[in-house]
Regions:
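A fold-level detector for beta-propeller and closely related beta-sheet-rich head/sensor domains
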Residues: 1-269
């Protein structure tokens, strides 16, 4: 199937196994509208493995029918994001030494899911987590257009006081925006209106801002009327590796600023 909005992403595992620094183990990740995330070996171009998002089973059925249609069949239609942790900074991602590599991806028009896989060992990937609009606290999640950003934020640390990685992403796209009446202001978005922060390892919700009722993990903002489909832009103003501010643009042409002051999530506004 075609590759539309996804694009090949190179992962350099370095001098892993029989590979060397001069001839590193390089893999390529890409999603397709058949519903698969593929990993290929760069040395031979052969597929190492493919992960299928089960929510896209209906898309496979439509492709099997092979009927002429004006509606495109979408699958994993979003770029992937890879985050690595090279503990000894030797340029090699060695899972036996505790190094980590994780891949995150949404579906864009393919659906309202966000996935995470552990690819620390590129030959044996492991499923980490999946969130969608049925997940508690994510009812506002729209089509997952907003490519997540990996970051560290104030107040989110492990037991040793080390900042834990998070994903920050917009609430997604509401396909009602495809209707010209929405652009004219006669229809309102009902999903995607917000910004989410989740734990990069577990997928647990850390914080959000949406029109939903205020809670310990959600800041209510009634003015969020439009879906946030674009990637957010985090800002580290003092270069300490921790995000101080997030900018997010919505599909209504508004630019939102989220401040993360101090060292406590409860002070975010």
């Amino acid at each position: 199937a075609d590759i539309l909005h996804s694009k090949p992403h190179i992962v350099n595992y370095g001098a892993r196994g029989s590979f060397t620094k001069e001839n590193p183990d390089i893999r390529i990740l890409v999603g397709t509208n058949a519903g698969f995330l593929h990993m290929f070996g760069n040395s031979d171009g052969q597929e190492d493995w493919a992960f299928f998002a089960k929510e896209l089973g209906a898309a496979l059925a439509r492709r099997n029918q092979n009927q002429i249609s004006t509606k495109r069949v979408y699958g994993i239609d979003s770029p992937v994001v890879v985050a690595t942790e090279d503990l000894n900074h030797d340029g090699t991602i060695d899972h036996t030494a505790g190094d980590k590599a994780r891949v995150y991806f949404g579906l864009r028009r393919g659906g309202r899911e966000l996935y995470a896989l552990d690819i620390s060992n590129p030959d044996t990937p492991a499923f980490l987590w999946r969130i969608n609009d049925d997940s508690a606290g994510f009812e506002e999640l729209g089509q997952t257009w907003s490519v997540p950003v990996v970051a560290r934020i104030p107040g989110y640390k492990d037991d040793q006081g080390k900042y834990k990685p998070v994903l920050i992403f917009g609430g997604g796209y509401d396909p009602i925006k495809d209707d010209h009446n929405t652009l004219a202001g006669t229809n309102n978005d009902s999903m995607g209106r917000g910004v989410f922060i989740v734990d990069a390892v577990t997928g647990a919700k850390v914080w959000s801002v949406t029109p939903a009722a205020k809670s310990s993990k959600n800041l209510q903002e009634a003015g969020l009327l439009h879906s946030v489909a674009a990637p957010v832009t985090p800002m580290d103003s003092n270069g300490d590796g921790v995000i101080d501010r997030i900018y997010a643009a919505d599909t209504g042409g508004n630019l939102w600023r989220i401040d993360l002051p101090g060292d406590a999530l409860t002070t975010s506004s």
